[in-house]
Amino acid sequence: MKCLKDGFLHHIRSIKSGSTLTAVSSNQLVNLYSKSGLLREARNVFDEMLERNVYSWNAVIAAYVKFNNVKEARELFESDNCERDLITYNTLLSGFAKTDGCESEAIEMFGEMHRKEKDDIWIDDFTVTTMVKLSAKLTNVFYGEQLHGVLVKTGNDGTKFAVSSLIHMYSKCGKFKEVCNIFNGSCVEFVDSVARNAMIAAYCREGDIDKALSVFWRNPELNDTISWNTLIAGYAQNGYEEEALKMAVSMEENGLKWDEHSFGAVLNVLSSLKSLKIGKEVHARVLKNGSYSNKFVSSGIVDVYCKCGNMKYAESAHLLYGFGNLYSASSMIVGYSSQGKMVEAKRLFDSLSEKNLVVWTAMFLGYLNLRQPDSVLELARAFIANETNTPDSLVMVSVLGACSLQAYMEPGKEIHGHSLRTGILMDKKLVTAFVDMYSKCGNVEYAERIFDSSFERDTVMYNAMIAGCAHHGHEAKSFQHFEDMTEGGFKPDEITFMALLSACRHRGLVLEGEKYFKSMIEAYNISPETGHYTCMIDLYGKAYRLDKAIELMEGIDQVEKDAVILGAFLNACSWNKNTELVKEVEEKLLVIEGSNGSRYIQIANAYASSGRWDEMQRIRHQMRGKELEIFSGCSWANIDKQFHMFTSSDISHYETEAIYAMLHFVTKDLSEIDEIMI
């Protein structure tokens, strides 16, 4: 039976004649139906078989794995009468390895196979390369290195599959030196197009597009769809979206048609560019081509419309061919959250009968980006109760972000404990999130412990540590971390200097502040932003060096249009009791923010600090009759896992009388302490 038509005819004839199919014929039909996408028919043939052998079980399990139904494949595998061999194990192992959320099952099965070697279930090179690919997916280089050792020990490290898998794994894990060693050290006969494509992808991840192109052009056999798709994706991931589109056009000019991966890569580029017009054109081509049945293509279409802010088109596309596609659903959730529509996002989220980590993460990030920490923590409780997904580092980062926003350490410590118990990979993003959370919760010691225990660091992690120390008055530690950072070869950015200048401002360290400000501009070629200027102006103002603040203001372009900088300079004038400058700043500031009530209050207080009560009354009088926006500051306390929020002179709390009574006693005690100290 070489084709589907022959298989159908043979099957129909056997049904009409009432004859029983042989085991060989049944196995052929199962394979034929599964290859043709007829999974239900394949299962029916399998269920009707009177006699099954190991080939029968392998055929039907492979069919379910092919269609990403590892749950059903596992049930068949674990059934009492299932006959298994190495192919059966490898088939299910590959299914677990490529299915999101089943990575732990793959690791368990690999361990089981290792234990069953005495039962003739030998681990072969396919088994190990499958696990190497899983290591790449998890970016777990430690596990990947162990598997590399197994391949070397068994003499399978030079096979074509092993070479391409190892290149891919080390590339994904950021070990580019090892990538080059494997590629350059392999025999030419084992470096096939798969390995060369893996090398192209590795160069792209490293950001070296020129070398990727060099490999591509030097090997004419790479003029295929896979190689072109790799380059298109490589340009895109390095921020060269326009070049990626040109490469996609060149691909067709070279006689190659776009496939599902091409459409997916192009749609990702259009999402980044927010190109609605071209997105619609590609959408039309997808409909004509029929590639919309691919989940990545259909979710890519939805994502383009979401990124372009056209939720009406996105909703239509999702309903037409994204229904049941969790990647499409996650794009919709991100689209809704980007427009602040978390009610719609939550409604879609709740309507999903099945949720994977991608969907959960989209919801977590949606709430976090809109600064709704309570909702993040509530969602985290629902995630734990769900018990169908194991939290990954991105989920943990989202919850830790919520803890940081509320300075709420307890959930953060629970996540820390969970990560230690489960042995989850502490990547740089997760370590940075822990450092940030502990710092913002006031436990700088814990933050430093985690920072010191990290083997891999980057600029973002150093920034979190420097900012944490600066915020809590440990300016010497901030400066030391900066020295360690630069000595380690990490390049500071504008956030680094923002943290350093904040440390100087808190302690009134004028000389150090000037040194870092000058270094930022001259040594690192970083243009100062509003935050850097306000730090320096505050620093000069508190040090009673108003002349320096004036000199700095004179060198800032378009300063009269920046309300934040003018507000900082107003404070500096107030501290130095310079009412003439307060008057000048008042005129400029109210032109920009004449509807902001907080600015009127700030100006009135500036006059009051200099004893100019007449000017203060004038400002207060101007406020009358105007519809001004006044934003009240607030404080909160967490007691028994419940947040209590208060604004100035708040009387809304149900225990208001008791709270004010306690505040009265505390204030009285503090006054007595002040008198004793004086």
UniProtKB/Swiss-Prot annotation:
Keyword presence, Repeat: yes
BP terms from Gene Ontology: RNA modification
Any GO molecular function: RNA binding
Residue numbers spanned by region Type E motif: 565-640
Keywords: Repeat
PPR repeats: 22-56, 57-84, 85-116, 124-158, 159-190, 192-222, 224-258, 259-293, 294-324, 325-359, 360-390, 392-426, 427-457, 458-492, 493-528, 529-563
InterPro entries in the cross-refs: E_motif (IPR046848), Pentatricopeptide_rpt (IPR002885), PPR_At4g14850-like_plant (IPR046960), TPR-like_helical_dom_sf (IPR011990)
Region (Type E(+) motif): 641-671
This protein's record includes keyword Repeat: yes
PANTHER family assigned to the protein according to its UniProt record, in alphabetical order: PENTATRICOPEPTIDE REPEAT-CONTAINING PROTEIN
Family to which the UniProt record says this protein belongs: Belongs to the PPR family. PCMP-E subfamily.
Protein's name in the database: Putative pentatricopeptide repeat-containing protein At3g18840
Source organism of this protein record: Arabidopsis thaliana (Mouse-ear cress)
Lineage: Eukaryota, Viridiplantae, Streptophyta, Embryophyta, Tracheophyta
Gene name in the database record: PCMP-E92
